[in-house]
Curated annotation (Swiss-Prot):
Belongs to the orexin family. Its main location: endoplasmic reticulum. This is Hypocretin neuropeptide precursor. The gene is Hcrt. Keywords: Amidation, Cleavage on pair of basic residues, Cytoplasmic vesicle, Disulfide bond, Endoplasmic reticulum, Neuropeptide, Pyrrolidone carboxylic acid, Signal, Synapse. One of its GO terms (cellular component) is neuronal dense core vesicle lumen. The keyword Transferase does not apply. It comes from Mus musculus (Mouse). It is found in: Rough endoplasmic reticulum; Cytoplasmic vesicle; Synapse. Pfam families: Orexin. Specific enzymatic cleavages at paired basic residues yield the different active peptides. It comes from the Eukaryota. One of its GO terms (molecular function) is type 1 orexin receptor binding.
Length: 130
């Protein structure tokens, strides 16, 4: 049985080694860029670090990071509590925008027979809020 000759030219092997070996050796000697102290100590919000090391869909979070606008601090705080608490996160998050919009609506009723603003803003429509 005769196998065809598969000799590789010496110049091609040398060129390949010259192209691949130096970057590989340099990458071993280079340390990863250290994290800022605030991220290491968790004293500030390092959103990109949290996206990379947190749980969930990192790609979606990273791709939308530059497009997000900071919301009102109350809304952000409530979202953080919903995400970190136990329970049905989806229900709370999906109704959060509706509740935030309800708080900004003018209250049409004035007088003693009207419910308070907090109960109308937080109670779901058609329910008692309990």
């Amino acid at each position: 049985m005769n196998f065809p000759s598969t000799k590789v030219p010496w110049a091609a092997v040398t060129l390949l080694l010259l192209l691949l070996l130096p970057p590989a050796l340099l990458s071993l000697g280079v340390d990863a860029q250290p994290l800022p102290d605030c991220c290491r100590q968790k004293t500030c919000s390092c959103r990109l670090y949290e996206l990379l090391h947190g749980a969930g869909n990192h790609a979606a979070g990273i791709l939308t990071l530059g497009k997000r606008r900071p919301g009102p601090p109350g809304l952000q705080g409530r979202l953080q509590r919903l995400l970190q608490a136990n329970g049905n996160h989806a229900a709370g998050i999906l109704t959060m925008g509706r509740r935030a919009g309800a708080e900004l609506e003018p209250h049409p009723c004035s007088g003693r027979g009207c419910p308070t603003v907090t109960t109308t803003a937080l109670a779901p429509r058609g329910g008692s809020g309990v």
